[in-house]
Amino acid sequence: MSRGTGAGYDRHITIFSPEGRLYQVEYAFKAVKSAGVTSIGVRGKDSVCVVTQKKVPDKLLDHTSVTHLFPITKYIGLLATGLTADARSLVYQARNEAAEFRFKWGYEMPVDVLAKWIADKAQVYTQHAYMRPLGVVAMVLGYDEEKNAQLFKCDPAGHFFGHKATSAGLKEQEAINFLEKKMKDDPQFSYEETVQIAISALQSVLQEDFKATEIEVGVVRKDDRVFRALTTEEIDQHLTAISERD
C-alpha cells in the first residue's frame, strides 16, 4: 500500500498522516453521524433552545429512560449527539468539574468556561494514546448575567465556538443551510419563536412531522435561568403552533 493512503496512520491517535490528518479524530466525527440522530440549537433574544430526535431502538424499552439532554448544573444544560455511553462519561466529568468550581469560587460556573473545559478535555484526548477521542458533539447552553443567552458547540477535535444557531449529527450541513437563511438578518427571537424555529428546522431537514414523543427539547430562559426539558404537552403545543402557522 502506498505511503499516502493512510495505512498504519489510522491505528494511532497521536500520529499525523503525510497529508496532515488525524484519522482517529476523523473517525470520531463519523461516529457522531453514525448514531443517525440530528440535533439543532438556536439562541434567541432572551432564551436558548436545543432540540434533537428521540429514537427508541427497542419496543420493550421504557422511552422515558432514553435521553440526550443532561443538566450539568441547575442553570447549564448539555445536549449530546453521538455515542450515548461516551456522552454519559463526559456529563459525569462535567458535573464534577462544575461542582468543584462552585465549591472553590462560590458562584456558578459560567457557560463559556464549562464549554472551554469540555473542549480542552477533548483536545487532550487527541494527543495521548491511552485515551481515544469521545464520539460526541456537545451543545452547551445557559443564560449568563453578563453575556445573556449562550450556546456553544464542542466537538471531538477540541474546537468550541459560540453560536447564534448550530446543528450536529447526520443532517448537520442541511440544517445549517436552513438556519443560515433564518438567521440572516440577525433576528431577535422571542422564547416561543426560538423553540419553534429549532423544531421546524429539524422537521424541515428530515422532512418529517414529528409527534411530541419523537423529539426532545431543552430550554433556558432569562426569567429564571434554569435549564429544563419541555414536557410532552409543551412540545405538542409548539408543534400545533408550527402546523397552524405553516
Swiss-Prot record:
Which cysteine pairs are joined by S-S bonds?
none
Transmembrane portions of the chain? none
Q: Which keywords are on file for this protein?
A: Cytoplasm, Nucleus, Proteasome
Q: Where in the cell is it found?
A: Cytoplasm; Nucleus
Q: Give the highest taxon in the source lineage.
A: Eukaryota
- Pfam families tied to this protein: Proteasome, Proteasome_A_N
The Gene Ontology biological process terms listed for this entry are:
proteasome-mediated ubiquitin-dependent protein catabolic process
Question: What's the chief localization of this chain?
Answer: cytoplasm
Function text: The proteasome is a multicatalytic proteinase complex which is characterized by its ability to cleave peptides with Arg, Phe, Tyr, Leu, and Glu adjacent to the leaving group at neutral or slightly basic pH. The proteasome has an ATP-dependent proteolytic activity.
NCBIfam families per the UniProt record, alphabetical: PRK03996.1
Protein family: Belongs to the peptidase T1A family.
Q: What is this protein called?
A: Proteasome subunit alpha type-6
Q: Native species of this protein?
A: Oryza sativa subsp. japonica
